[in-house]
């Protein structure tokens, strides 16, 4: 891995495609409830980053594939780290909705 690869942002469109192709996967939006209401990716579940560690069981199966996004990719990166610390083993940061050009729900 070269130095600049470390700073490369995830591609949210690739992440959404992977989510759609993965049976049983959960698409997790870690933005605030207000941000979520303003527009979110269809099928996503909202658990704000600030509440993530208070969730007893986001999913009973800690191996379930979780695809995590936020606005820019920063909170989702933090959420992935926290979820891994909580024992979730199949977690992926897919970036931020700011770069998303697909359909959103309100």
Regions picked out by a protein language model, each given a short descriptive name:
Residues 69:
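Short, surface-exposed ligand- or partner-binding patches at beta-edge/loop junctions that are enriched
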Residues 29:
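N-terminal glycine-rich beta->alpha transition that marks the start or flank
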